[in-house]
């Protein structure tokens, strides 16, 4: 889609079949919604695809990049209200990178960059990310955190651990702390993007949770149905990878 800027007819048909199968598997009267992100919103034939799916009874909400960023930021505020300091939240998807910057729980700005692991291919164009060097420099360096989410972030974190780039963790803990080692060694498509983001943002910690846009959409649906603030029940232990970064080594 990112190369041709079009959703092939075969993929539209396949999506219909997947949605129909999913709908059939749900108990009757189960509330559900369908949301589409960067690939759908950038496709030149999105109106045609949207109409065809609607004709089959499937109403799709096409999210903007800023709507994605807001959903994810809202999720983390609900789930981890104790997060403090200056936090940059980066959610990397297939076609876009959603960013939210907050200080002491106050949102400062949000942005959506045309940078994703499927769009990037083997050599990602980091120019949209490099443009943030000056805005980053204006933010206080003290108590900086970077929260990276999405499937690419989880894959990156798991590869860092499995390849021994991080040492063994302490069993039974929901937050694992690791000392910083070269992050580019993880052979994932997202490693270059995340490594450059760390070099630019210079955080004291990187947090890699296992929740992201999907959970943000679920939380949003729950709050719409209940008409009140909600919080997802994620179990007693939410898997989180927390990486401590000695500042002298961030740029290495």
Q: What feature does the model see in each segment?
A:
Residues 2-23, 40-50, 54-86, 101-252:
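Helical "lid/coupling" subdomains associated with nucleotide-phosphate turnover
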